[in-house]
Regions:
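Short linear S-[DN]-x-LW-Φ motif typified by the pepsin-like aspartic protease active-site region
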Residues: 2-102, 116-137, 145-153, 208-212, ...
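Generic short beta-strand segments
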Residues: 102-108
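Right-handed parallel beta-helix
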Residues: 135-180
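Short, surface-exposed interaction patches in beta-rich subdomains
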Residues: 45, 105, 167-264
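Acidic/histidine-rich helix-loop elements
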Residues: 111
């Protein structure tokens, strides 16, 4: 028998900024977790995130997407296909600690079984003219991360850590950018304003474009079993250069290709 999840009281809902769609799945069997029969939930956090410039995702299973909503006044978070007992949302509201979005699969849970629809965590933020992350940190054990943006996502620093998944993005402005991908590809259309970028894809390819001229950067591009390409030229498996400006890009893909392009 499927266990029932008790809905929050009106007071709890108001306090947390949580909007519950009780009839999202209409209780059909196809939306239950195949292993436990637990119902899957949809949760929307629509208030209380105006000053949430420091956000951390710690996800065992699911896809994380950051989108730009040019008409939005503040960030919102929409989560679907959730096991509620695995999900935690923490927001102190005082800007002293990051907003934390956590989805932790129990250690003894058999991930080899069919888990049903993949959980999705979608963070919508206003455009870069009105919203700027101090720090955005995304850790996913099994699932992709995507910046699905036509406008720029801006941050002081961005940290990505994906064990089994790919990262794709359009345009990002960040001073510090770090990505570690154990098994998957990295593809970012434009990284602007970066001072230090470090990307490692242990078993995948790296594709990155940065703003500026080639000699604006100190470079360390390395692969063991693939090719290094810099502005369309195929280099050896290792390419390094120094620069007078304190901007650096380090890209490492031992088993894949490294492709770096500058806009000028």
């Amino acid at each position: 028998t499927a266990s029932m999840v008790v809905a929050p009281t009106e007071e709890e809902t108001a306090a947390s900024g949580l909007v519950r769609n009780e009839d999202f799945y209409n209780g059909t069997a196809a939306t239950e977790d195949a292993d436990s029969g637990s119902p899957l939930e949809k949760m929307d956090f629509t208030t209380g995130l105006a000053d949430a410039k420091n956000i951390t995702f710690d996800i065992d299973y699911g896809a994380v997407t950051v989108v730009v909503d040019g008409g939005a006044a503040e960030p919102t978070l929409s989560c679907t296909n959730l096991r509620q007992d695995w999900f935690t949302f923490t927001n102190t509201g005082d800007n002293t600690s990051p907003v934390r979005v956590s989805y932790k699969v129990p250690a003894n849970y058999n991930l080899g079984k069919e888990l049903g629809p993949e959980p999705e965590f979608v963070l919508s933020v206003p455009d870069a003219n009105t919203f700027h992350f101090k720090r955005l940190s995304i850790t996913v054990a099994m699932g992709d991360a995507e910046f699905d943006n036509s406008d720029t996502i801006a941050a002081d620093s961005i940290d990505l850590d994906l064990a089994m998944g790919c990262f794709t993005g359009s345009t990002v402005q960040a001073e510090q950018f770090t990505a570690n991908i154990s098994m998957g590809d990295f593809d970012l259309g434009l990284l602007a304003g970066v001072e230090t970028a470090k990307v490692e894809a242990a078993m995948g390819d790296i594709g990155l474009t940065v703003d500026g001229r080639p000699d604006d950067y100190a470079l360390d591009l390395q692969t063991s079993m693939g090719n290094v390409m810099f502005n369309g030229r195929t280099m050896s498996s290792t390419y390094t250069q120094t620069a007078a400006a304190p901007r650096s890009v380090t890209l490492t893909a031992p088993m894949g290709d490294v492709v770096l392009t500058t806009t000028q």
